[in-house]
Structures are given as structure tokens and as C-alpha cells.
């Protein structure tokens, strides 16, 4: 893929004795950019949703799903979340699922473009390498810190949508009528 080629080209710049900068022909969009900043913790960067489920959910379904999903999510496996929440065919959860990687790509691109984070070479890490560790390996402490930033952002992007879904689940579990008033009451109890 061209992203892998971009990583290799970045490595060639270093091998030639030049600094890896945009001025020297360095590339921003590489395989590491995609793997470690757009799909980290799985497609849609769902770790924010998982953290909500584990620590803040009121519904039994979300609490249990969060506990079952936190382990796989740390290793970039999020199928339990994608299909059990569900995110698939769910217009409420589709919004943060799409928006989160877009926001992450803009923030990551900016960080690389401005030099806050060094451009990535051809160092590849296995796709199951947990975040923060993978950031350290592909770009040093700056990339690890950037992962902390984008993963924290994922929590706040997912938060209003997760609260709505949790309120729907909680109302159903407690046999409450699903009305705006009921949902607002349950949402107010979250975070």
C-alpha cells in the first residue's frame, strides 16, 4: 500500500543522512498514522465507549459488555463492542464511530505537520500492541502522549451518545416507559 511506501520513504530519508522532516520530503500519512492513531483500539476508536461502559454505565447490559470488552479493546480488538452495543446499524452510535477517527486524524496530522510529534519511519508494531506502548515504539514519548490525547478525546466524543444508549437500555431493563423525560433523568445520573 502507498502508506507502507511512505513509511519506507521516510526511512530512506534517514538512511541518506538527512533529518526526517517535511522539508526533506518526509511523509505524514503512513501505515503507523493509520494503525496507531485512526484505528487504535479498533475501528472507530471505541475505547472511549468501553471506558464509559466500565466506569459510568447504569444499564446492566453496558456494564457487563464493558467488563467483557476492556481486555480485547486494549489489544485493538473491538468486535464485541461493534456488534453487541450494537454500533452496526445503529444511527445513534454511528455518529461517534465515524467522527472519532476523523477528529483523531486531524489532531494527529496537525501534531506531525507542526513537528510536535516526529514523523514516523518504517518501524512497524504488531496490530495487537496496546496503545501507549505502540506510540512509544513508533514515535517515542511524543507519539505515546499523542495517543493519550486522542484516546481521551474519544471518551468525550462518545460520551453524549453512550449516555443516550445507556439510558435507553436502563429504561428497558427497569421496565420504565421510554420517554424523553425518563431518558433525561437517567442521562443526568451518568457522568
Residue ranges: model-predicted function:
Residues 3-6:
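Short, small-residue-biased leader/transition segments that mark boundaries at the very start
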Residues 12-31, 48-50, 68, 82-191:
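Transmembrane alpha-helical segments and their short flanking loops
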Residues 31-39:
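Individual transmembrane alpha-helix segments
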Residues 45-74:
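Membrane-embedded helical hairpins/re-entrant loop segments and their flanking transmembrane helices
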Amino acid at each position: 500500500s502507498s502508506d507502507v511506501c511512505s513509511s519506507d520513504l521516510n526511512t530512506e530519508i534517514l538512511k541518506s543522512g538527512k533529518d526526517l522532516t517535511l522539508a526533506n520530503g518526509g511523509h505524514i500519512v503512513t501505515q503507523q498514522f493509520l494503525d496507531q492513531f485512526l484505528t487504535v483500539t479498533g475501528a472507530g476508536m471505541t475505547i472511549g465507549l468501553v471506558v464509559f461502559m466500565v466506569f459510568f454505565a447504569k444499564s446492566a447490559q453496558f456494564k457487563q459488555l464493558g467488563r467483557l470488552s476492556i481486555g480485547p479493546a486494549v489489544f485493538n480488538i473491538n468486535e464485541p463492542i461493534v456488534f453487541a452495543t450494537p454500533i452496526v446499524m445503529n444511527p445513534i452510535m454511528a455518529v461517534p464511530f465515524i467522527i472519532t477517527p476523523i477528529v483523531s486524524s486531524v489532531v494527529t496530522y496537525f501534531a506531525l505537520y507542526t513537528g510536535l510529534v516526529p514523523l514516523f519511519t518504517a518501524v512497524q508494531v504488531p496490530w495487537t500492541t496496546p496503545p501507549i506502548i505502540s506510540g512509544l515504539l513508533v514515535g517515542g514519548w511524543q507519539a505515546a502522549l499523542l495517543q493519550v490525547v486522542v484516546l481521551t478525546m474519544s471518551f468525550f466524543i462518545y460520551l453524549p451518545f453512550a449516555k443516550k444508549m445507556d439510558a435507553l437500555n436502563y429504561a428497558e431493563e427497569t421496565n420504565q416507559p421510554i420517554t424523553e423525560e425518563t431518558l433525561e433523568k437517567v442521562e443526568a445520573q451518568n457522568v
